[in-house]
Amino acid sequence: MKALSKLHAKPGIWMTDVEKPECGYNDLLIKIKKTAICGTDVHIYKWDDWSQKTIPVPMVVGHEYVGEVAAMGDGVRGFEIGDRVSGEGHITCGHCRNCRAGRRHLCRNTYGVGVNRPGAFAEYLALPAENAFKLPDDVTDEMAAVFDPFGNAVHTALAFDLVGEDVLITGAGPIGIMAAAVARHVGARHVVITDVNEYRLDLARKMGVTRAVDVSKEKLSDVMTELGMKEGFDVGLEMSGVPSAFSQMLETMNHGGKIAMLGIPPENIAIDWNQVIFKGLVIKGIYGREMFETWYKMASLLQSGLDISPILTHEMPIDDFEKGFETMISGQSGKVILNWD
């Protein structure tokens, strides 16, 4: 079958012909319809330090997808041939304390689809059935293809109560922008997002943020004054991994504020702990999606009228995958969809 693989230990991803995966006793065999390019895939494409330490070569990559059930193992219940599905890319062990306590997203032995085992950039994907999510009919294939990053956004945005709160989001990448849309949808008062990429700040404006701020041209303190904010932000969503953005978040948080961190900063980031301690801030790390509460929330948010379609900026056939990666790397895009049909 056709697949995109990390074929060599150097920059690039290659179109390959690989064996169709076998469907195990508890697996679904999923015929892939659409995939999306993730920032993780870009890291793998560039072959950065993290990728060199993490990704086995050769291996099929990719983990954002939608497809149909083409075959089922004998032990599978609850699915039928033809069901539309997406799937949780974190495959957990089932026997550690967190798994047994129902906190599978905190499994200490997680394996990643397209990271530690063959991925979804292929005509077929074999996946444990317990990791598959059956999609409601009113969720489009395009939306379902980005459920993985949308889930990161939902998990982060809903980490703390947002109703009536002023929310600062640092980092207007696709996940940050989707988190901003979620925050507005669930009742936040002001949602302010910061970045230096004007293309993506414009996308955030289309998604309904109160203010999208280019911090290279505008002071966040001036925006807060403009909005009549006297006491700082109640909730912060750190999506950038940029140390200066996190420092600015700490400075502008209200006393008793809460911060959810999804962005991954460089090692040994300096933190002004006086801001954290004397303001009584709560900082929570966010990893992946809660299984499967986040997935049900994603579907419900879309069904209740949340529109994140502006984030889907490019769509192209799989044979144009090089163009897709170039578009993502340029920073002049939201999510890029690759069609396998």
UniProtKB/Swiss-Prot annotation:
Pathway: Amino-acid degradation; L-threonine degradation via oxydo-reductase pathway; glycine from L-threonine: step 1/2. Keywords: Cytoplasm, Metal-binding, NAD, Oxidoreductase, Zinc. The active site is at T40, H43. Zn(2+) 1 binds at C38, H63, E64. The record marks D148 as: Important for catalytic activity for the proton relay mechanism but does not participate directly in the coordination of zinc atom. NAD(+) binds at I175, D195, R200, L262, G263, I264, I286, Y287. The keyword Transmembrane does not apply. Pfam families: ADH_N (PF08240), ADH_zinc_N (PF00107). Zn(2+) 2 binds at C93, C96, C99, C107. Gene3D superfamilies: Medium-chain alcohol dehydrogenases, catalytic domain, NAD(P)-binding Rossmann-like Domain. Binds 2 Zn(2+) ions per subunit. Its EC number is 1.1.1.103. Coiled coil: none annotated. The keyword Transport does not apply. GO terms for molecular function: L-threonine 3-dehydrogenase activity; zinc ion binding. GO terms for biological process: L-threonine catabolic process to glycine. GO terms for cellular component: cytoplasm. InterPro entries: ADH-like_C (IPR013149), ADH-like_N (IPR013154), ADH_Zn_CS (IPR002328), GroES-like_sf (IPR011032), L-Threonine_3-DHase (IPR004627), NAD(P)-bd_dom_sf (IPR036291), PKS_ER (IPR020843), Zn_alcohol_dh (IPR050129). Its cofactor is Zn(2+). Homotetramer. Catalyzes the NAD(+)-dependent oxidation of L-threonine to 2-amino-3-ketobutyrate. Belongs to the zinc-containing alcohol dehydrogenase family. This is L-threonine 3-dehydrogenase.
